[in-house]
């Protein structure tokens, strides 16, 4: 990937009011994107957002820029990121734009693009947009200006799409489900999907006010969900993040079920139904218990770099159809084009309904290994601690002691002088001691 000025691996993101998430920048971005995308023929762009208060300001700025370039905007209102990808495909729009900062706090926001087929924009198009940003903004003739309109049935369309990924012969009528929508974009979607499939639904995190997205609710903080599942004696809980591309679950005992366990359940069910093609893709952070459990089932497993973008790239490279991060991004290419929390959750619910098993029992075939993470700061000018012989020696000792039943992963932070030490194995006390031994070696450099 070339050096970008604005686009990161997941679009453009930052604190609202600070560059680049300012009204003037976003207007210019809309104009530049419009100039580039207009070359491709269609003049429609879908714009969706999550529930952040800044979404109103940013969608107006985007629309003004697009209109100046001669493109029309179709607004969805608050809508999950995967819904925008789906609507972009079905409306055959030239692109879809999501205004969201996913699981971040309300004061952050971001802009992410989807291409006409519901996948990430090609690098070449992002680079062309960046090149256009360097030019002086101009306006097409008045007769050529773009317009804005609203897709009034956007939510209904996406609800039907989600329901269609759940087998017709199954029902959720025997399940009591607590759903936590993080006060985010799934608040008017997920409870309706589950109710229409027959579930008894208790909804929390469904009262967005513009500033409470992801605040002590949702996939990044499941404590409220765990408490409610136990209080209601529910069969399970499902949590989404602010833009609905992540899902984390909670079993009837209040235990957290993460993206690794969700992928295990879906992959095993695919194997049982004769629908699994190839293997499954995780990341460097995926639990070793997942790798061993899939191996026992004869399902190939590969690790990608951390980030759903890299998971998708590895899936495409291998020709596989399922991938996930332990954070809850689950990509099911047989169902959709991007990570979709609602669709992934429905596949787990289908496995529960088909096998008449609890979520707790479906997870029992996979033993999660203790994973200990230690962050170690180092002096930026002191060179790379990971290249130091003493660190290499201690790491080699730990790897030898763990053998094939554990892992060591050392990663440098991309944003600060920090080494992330991760040690994984069967014995938590031993793994903790090993992690701190490596951390001490890094500190001593």
From Swiss-Prot:
One of its GO terms (cellular component) is cytosol. Activated by phosphorylation. Keywords: Isomerase, Magnesium, Metal-binding, Phosphoprotein. InterPro entries: A-D-PHexomutase_a/b/a-I (IPR005844), A-D-PHexomutase_a/b/a-I/II/III (IPR016055), A-D-PHexomutase_a/b/a-II (IPR005845), A-D-PHexomutase_a/b/a-III (IPR005846), A-D-PHexomutase_C (IPR005843), A-D-PHexomutase_C_sf (IPR036900), A-D-PHexomutase_CS (IPR016066), Alpha-D-phosphohexomutase_SF (IPR005841). Mg(2+) binds at residues 102, 241, 243, 245. Signal peptide: none annotated. It is an enzyme of class 5 (isomerase). The active site is at 102 (phosphoserine intermediate). The modification Phosphoserine is found at residue 102. PROSITE patterns: PGM_PMM. GO terms for molecular function: magnesium ion binding; phosphoglucosamine mutase activity; phosphomannomutase activity. Its cofactor is Mg(2+). GO terms for biological process: carbohydrate metabolic process; peptidoglycan biosynthetic process; UDP-N-acetylglucosamine biosynthetic process. It comes from the Bacteria. It catalyses: alpha-D-glucosamine 1-phosphate = D-glucosamine 6-phosphate. Pfam families: PGM_PMM_I (PF02878), PGM_PMM_II (PF02879), PGM_PMM_III (PF02880), PGM_PMM_IV (PF00408). Binds 1 Mg(2+) ion per subunit. Its EC number is 5.4.2.10. Belongs to the phosphohexose mutase family. PANTHER family: PHOSPHOGLUCOMUTASE (ALPHA-D-GLUCOSE-1,6-BISPHOSPHATE-DEPENDENT), PHOSPHOHEXOSE MUTASE. This is Phosphoglucosamine mutase. It comes from Escherichia coli O1:K1 / APEC.
